[in-house]
Amino acid sequence: MLAMSHQTASSRLPEWARRTIGTASQVSTVEKIVKQRSLHTICEEGRCPNRAECYAQKTATFLLMGPVCTRACGFCQVAGGKALPLDPQEPEKVAEAVALLGLKYVVLTSVARDDLPDQGAGWFVRTMESIRARNCAVEIEVLTPDFRGEEACIATVVAARPVCFNHNIETVRRLQSYARRAATYARSLAVLAAVKRLDAEIFTKSGLMLGHGETREEVLETLLDLRKVGCDRVTLGQYLQPSKDHLPVHKYWTPAEFAELGAVARDLGFAHVRSGPLVRSSYHAGEPE
């Protein structure tokens, strides 16, 4: 049984964890293109603190297969419940949005779709094919659920050759059952290991959200475990409680602590590291280290 401290962080958000949502002029272009096509972004559904910055740069992370997840992890803003029917036009709509925004690097993610026979793996591929049909030079990163660990699903996405395959381990081993629903530490490591086994040339990536009660030593252990399965890239960010119904914040890690963890990650051999309070999975994903 998980032993958790009842101590939580102050309800007052530190200044360094605050960011403006931006002005209408900054976000209007991306919002218009996305909303006109009834598309979804994790920027909006996940209430990402960086969405104004990304929208101002005309970038977004597209959320495939609807805004409703078949899981309901305690930290996540995305709605959980009965998943919606797939929109057969979604892959082409995403491709059109990518073209209109002039994107050279695209991140595709999705809700968990445990209701689908292939967990949604084929939908990633269809969307990638639609994007490449318009511009084969676009680089595509995928941020996938764990596909219940089914290697056939992982192989389906790997065969489409994304430039980077991201699957987030989210938290340290001890806190998995506390923070994640229907997911495990070992399975997430196995997903990343499978990608490297299937195609060693594809970059693999994972991320952690700190603030659930983990210790520095546990974070370092997780970074080491990620490196053991060949993970190339990592993101470290601060968990921010979306609402009172979500898991509480147990600690606000400081910018200095994030900087130190980022330096440790680089020393461990991660080739691409993003570490800071407001860092999220696709933050500056297409930019060099």
UniProtKB/Swiss-Prot annotation:
Binding site for [4Fe-4S] cluster 2: C69, C73, C76
Pathway noted in the entry: Protein modification; protein lipoylation via endogenous pathway; protein N(6)-(lipoyl)lysine from octanoyl-[acyl-carrier-protein]: step 2/2
Reaction(s) the record says it catalyses: [[Fe-S] cluster scaffold protein carrying a second [4Fe-4S](2+) cluster] + N(6)-octanoyl-L-lysyl-[protein] + 2 oxidized [2Fe-2S]-[ferredoxin] + 2 S-adenosyl-L-methionine + 4 H(+) = [[Fe-S] cluster scaffold protein] + N(6)-[(R)-dihydrolipoyl]-L-lysyl-[protein] + 4 Fe(3+) + 2 hydrogen sulfide + 2 5'-deoxyadenosine + 2 L-methionine + 2 reduced [2Fe-2S]-[ferredoxin]
UniProt subcellular location: Cytoplasm
Residues engaged in binding [4Fe-4S] cluster 1: C43, C48, C54, S282
Main subcellular location of this protein, as a coarse class: cytoplasm
Recorded GO CC terms: cytoplasm
Limits of the Radical SAM core domain: 55-271
InterPro entries: Aldolase_TIM, Elp3/MiaA/NifB-like_rSAM, Lipoyl_synth, rSAM
Cofactor: [4Fe-4S] cluster
Enzyme Commission code: 2.8.1.8
Pfam families for this protein: Radical_SAM (PF04055)
Bound cofactor: record note: Binds 2 [4Fe-4S] clusters per subunit. One cluster is coordinated with 3 cysteines and an exchangeable S-adenosyl-L-methionine.
Keyword set, alphabetical order: 4Fe-4S, Cytoplasm, Iron, Iron-sulfur, Metal-binding, S-adenosyl-L-methionine, Transferase
GO molecular function terms noted in the UniProt entry: 4 iron, 4 sulfur cluster binding; lipoate synthase activity; metal ion binding
PANTHER family: LIPOYL SYNTHASE (PTHR10949), LIPOYL SYNTHASE, MITOCHONDRIAL (PTHR10949:SF0)
Family the UniProt entry places it in: Belongs to the radical SAM superfamily. Lipoyl synthase family.
Full protein name: Lipoyl synthase 2
Species in which this protein is naturally found: Gloeobacter violaceus (strain ATCC 29082 / PCC 7421)
